[in-house]
């Protein structure tokens, strides 16, 4: 399906709500997204073996995780309007998300040969309290994907004598091996379940392609660090992440933009 027809048929994407509950020792987070008319998605995140905690203090972090999760579903239709009912955003936050879509989705726009999109964001009135986590330890959360970057980070932290907590999303065999070799006895494991309806839309010819996964990992790592009491998050990103690799419609496309220093700085400022 082409962009013009998709946007005409599906003019509005809605981040309706999120929910979270303790299931055994795990935290189960669900998001409710809708696309008018007739499409809905309910992706799920499961954070395993969490400590005893009060869920209310994590509302803002979970709400923001839903915003980055939302992009994977919005891209199917590129609806020109995104309505945020689950919470509220100020002007600076709206600018952050529009910029993330514009730069972080550059490879997606290029792959699909469509114009750059900057959707209008309509925000709700629900105010989420900004929580200061004062009781964090001085530990370091290290996301592990199984590649050389995370292995380098773990080795550097080990040599520096730093306390490290390994963290992995849908860990592969390589990731599990890396954590074992690094001596991570009890890593934080997170399972992300994509709504199968999105995969069905992909098969039907809706828009599909690159999303800024490292930005997703940044928001998820922040939540995991807060839950498990880690003060810092350490990532190794190659220097080439700061460089674009192709020109498209007058803009430089960087398919690794969410690994760049520019994104890291914007993310730090956003989190403040």
Residues covered by each model-derived region:
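ATP-dependent adenylate-handling ligase core
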Residues: 50-52, 169-272
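RNA-binding accessory domains that recognize and position tRNA/RNA substrates
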Residues: 1-139, 151, 156-197, 201, ...
């Amino acid at each position: 399906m082409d962009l013009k027809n998709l946007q005409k048929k599906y003019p509005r994407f809605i981040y309706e709500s999120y929910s979270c509950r303790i299931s055994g020792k795990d935290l189960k987070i669900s998001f409710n997204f809708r696309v008018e008319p007739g499409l809905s998605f309910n992706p799920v995140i499961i954070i395993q073996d969490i400590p005893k905690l009060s869920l209310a203090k994590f509302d803002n972090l979970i709400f923001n995780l839903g915003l980055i999760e939302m992009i994977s579903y919005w891209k199917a239709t590129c609806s020109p309007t995104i309505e945020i009912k689950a919470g509220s955003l100020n002007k600076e936050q709206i600018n952050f998300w529009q910029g993330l879509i514009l730069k972080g989705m550059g490879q997606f726009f290029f792959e699909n040969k469509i114009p750059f999109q900057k959707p209008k964001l309509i925000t709700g009135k629900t105010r989420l309290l900004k929580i200061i986590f004062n009781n964090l330890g001085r530990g370091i959360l290290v996301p592990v994907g199984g590649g050389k970057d995370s292995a380098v980070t773990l080795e550097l932290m080990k040599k520096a004598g730093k306390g490290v907590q390994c963290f992995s999303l849908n860990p592969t065999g390589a990731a599990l091996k890396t954590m074992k070799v690094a001596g991570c006895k009890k890593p934080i494991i997170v399972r992300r379940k994509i709504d199968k309806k999105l995969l069905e839309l992909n098969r039907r010819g809706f828009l599909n392609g690159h999303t800024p996964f490292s930005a997703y990992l940044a928001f998820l790592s922040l939540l995991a660090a807060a839950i498990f009491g880690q003060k810092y998050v350490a990532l190794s990103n190659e220097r080439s992440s700061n460089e674009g690799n192709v020109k498209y419609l007058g803009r430089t496309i960087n398919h690794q933009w969410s690994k760049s220093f520019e994104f890291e700085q914007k993310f730090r400022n956003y989190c403040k």
